[in-house]
Regions:
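Extreme N-terminal tail/first-helix region
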Residues: 1-19
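Short secondary-structure boundary/capping segments
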Residues: 9-10, 36, 110-112
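Short, solvent-exposed coil/turn segments
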Residues: 13-15, 30, 62, 115
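Short beta-strand segments
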Residues: 15-50, 79
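Short, structured beta-strand-loop surface elements
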Residues: 51-125
Length: 125
């Protein structure tokens, strides 16, 4: 696994929203989707908060586990990895800290058991 450069992770982690596109089996990218993301440790984490496991982008991840990210002025090739759910509470805390200015119901959509079950780690490729 390749790690993010510190400045890259900082820039992406500070971005209010990021865009990701999941790679299809034919090598093309699915449409970009806008999601919230939080840095934790040496990685960036995203969740499918609105549609959960039914979101098209989330369902596409297992096809190739690859894609592209646009965040903080950067565009990078990425890999999607299963998150260690032992850190869900820490990722929750990162979401609460970064997005605390949003109404409770909006922020809380990222903290539900279903959203937590969709936590994905994003690493550079």
């Amino acid at each position: 696994m390749t790690a993010w450069a510190t400045d890259e992770l900082t820039k992406m982690g500070r971005a209010e929203e990021i865009e990701i596109a999941v790679r299809r089996a034919d090598g093309q990218l699915h449409n970009r989707v806008t999601v919230w993301a939080v840095p934790h440790g040496d990685a960036l984490y995203v969740r499918s908060a609105v549609k959960g496991r039914n979101a098209a982008w989330f369902r596409a991840v297992p096809e190739m586990h690859e894609g592209r990210i646009w965040a903080g002025g950067l565009e990078k090739e990425i890999a999607f990895e299963d998150a260690d759910h032992d850190i869900d509470d820490e990722v929750d805390a990162a979401y609460r800290s970064k997005y605390r200015r949003y109404a409770g119901r909006i922020l809380n959509s990222c903290l539900t058991p279903e959203a937590r079950s969709t936590t994905i780690k994003i690493v550079p490729r």
